[in-house]
């Protein structure tokens, strides 16, 4: 037989590097989609909590006009959640400081519960003034970071997210893109940065946990190959 016939024309297998890159791209898309829907869900849940205070971001006549309604707020929150959740583990890898504090799903679920509780407190508890509300929510938000994160990168990103998100929100309100239903605008501004900070920490923890699961899957596949 000829030498060319000794080689079986079986299916070619991709090398471990190509397989790893493909897996990372697919897992990145999956993580982004999961984070997006989590952000949309939390936006709707937190909006229902704020309705109790009549401070919802959604005007009551949603179907009246596309421009006067805030139907796009949940998708925007979902997109921001996806970006934040993907950014946290990326920053950890870039800084060479992998986040190893309380890396289990039970801790992540408790973090989400505390975040929802902080929002519920801002909507349910009556404070004497806006300064007291701001200080209380700031303490709760920092406590959330200390309990479930404790990383310098997480704190820095949380502060940056709170600043940028609050700035964008106020610009949209001042330009009339949407409006708060509460007449007390100072009340809204007193809790908004703290909620954004806590939300950034929460989505960062979810993103880190999803990224850790991805690393386990890729490690198992490379070990099998």
From Swiss-Prot:
Keywords: Cholesterol metabolism, Endoplasmic reticulum, Lipid metabolism, Lipid-binding, Membrane, Oxidation, Phosphoprotein, Steroid metabolism, Sterol metabolism, Thioester bond, Transmembrane, Transmembrane helix, Ubl conjugation
Function: Oxysterol-binding protein that mediates feedback control of cholesterol synthesis by controlling both endoplasmic reticulum to Golgi transport of SCAP and degradation of HMGCR. Acts as a negative regulator of cholesterol biosynthesis by mediating the retention of the SCAP-SREBP complex in the endoplasmic reticulum, thereby blocking the processing of sterol regulatory element-binding proteins (SREBPs) SREBF1/SREBP1 and SREBF2/SREBP2.
Localization per Swiss-Prot or TrEMBL: Endoplasmic reticulum membrane
Membrane topology value: Multi-pass membrane protein
Lumenal side: 52-70, 127-129, 176-189
PTM-bearing positions, type Cysteine sulfenic acid (-SOH): 215
Subunit-structure text: Interacts with SCAP; interaction is direct and only takes place in the presence of sterols; it prevents interaction between SCAP and the coat protein complex II (COPII). Associates with the SCAP-SREBP complex (composed of SCAP and SREBF1/SREBP1 or SREBF2/SREBP2); association is mediated via its interaction with SCAP and only takes place in the presence of sterols. Interacts with RNF139. Interacts with RNF145.
Family: Belongs to the INSIG family.
Cross-link (Glycyl cysteine thioester (Cys-Gly) (interchain with G-Cter in ubiquitin)): 215
Domain remark in the UniProt entry: Binds oxysterols in a pocket within their transmembrane domains and interacts with SCAP via transmembrane domains 3 and 4. The KxHxx motif mediates association with the coatomer complex.
Pfam families: INSIG
Disulfide bond residue pairs: none
Site note Required for the recognition of 25-hydroxycholesterol, residues: 115
GO CC annotations, alphabetized: SREBP-SCAP-Insig complex
Membrane-crossing segments per the record: 29-51, 71-88, 104-126, 130-148, 154-175, 190-207
GO molecular function: oxysterol binding
Post-translational modification, as annotated: Phosphorylation at Ser-151 by PCK1 reduces binding to oxysterol, disrupting the interaction between INSIG2 and SCAP, thereby promoting nuclear translocation of SREBP proteins (SREBF1/SREBP1 or SREBF2/SREBP2) and subsequent transcription of downstream lipogenesis-related genes. Polyubiquitinated by AMFR/gp78 at Cys-215 in some tissues such as adipose tissues, undifferentiated myoblasts and liver, leading to its degradation. In differentiated myotubes, Cys-215 oxidation prevents ubiquitination at the same site, resulting in protein stabilization.
Protein name per the record: Insulin-induced gene 2 protein
Motif (KxHxx): 219-225
Signal peptide range: none
Gene source species: Papio anubis (Olive baboon)
GO biological process: cellular response to insulin stimulus; cholesterol biosynthetic process; SREBP signaling pathway; SREBP-SCAP complex retention in endoplasmic reticulum
Membrane side Cytoplasmic: residue ranges: 1-28, 89-103, 149-153, 208-225
């Amino acid at each position: 037989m000829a030498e060319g016939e000794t080689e079986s024309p079986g299916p070619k297998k991709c090398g471990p590097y190509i397989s790893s890159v493909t897996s990372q791209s697919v897992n990145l898309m999956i993580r982004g989609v999961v984070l997006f829907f989590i952000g949309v869900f939390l936006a709707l849940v937190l909006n229902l909590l704020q309705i109790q205070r009549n401070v919802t971001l959604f005007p009551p006549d949603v179907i009246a006009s596309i421009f006067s309604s805030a139907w796009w707020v949940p998708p925007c929150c979902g997109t921001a959640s996806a970006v934040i959740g993907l950014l946290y583990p990326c920053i950890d890898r870039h800084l060479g400081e992998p986040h190893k504090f309380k890396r289990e799903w039970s801790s992540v679920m408790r973090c989400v519960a505390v975040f929802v509780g902080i929002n519920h407190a801002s909507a349910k508890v009556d404070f004497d003034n806006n300064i007291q509300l701001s200080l209380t929510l700031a303490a709760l938000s920092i406590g959330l970071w200390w309990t479930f994160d404790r990383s310098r990168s997480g704190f820095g990103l949380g502060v940056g997210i709170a600043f940028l998100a609050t700035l964008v929100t106020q610009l949209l309100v001042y330009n009339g893109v949407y409006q708060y239903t509460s007449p007390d605008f100072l009340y809204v501004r007193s809790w908004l940065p703290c909620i954004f900070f806590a939300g950034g920490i929460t989505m960062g923890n979810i993103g880190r946990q999803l990224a850790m699961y991805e690393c386990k899957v890729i490690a198992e596949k490379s070990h099998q190959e």
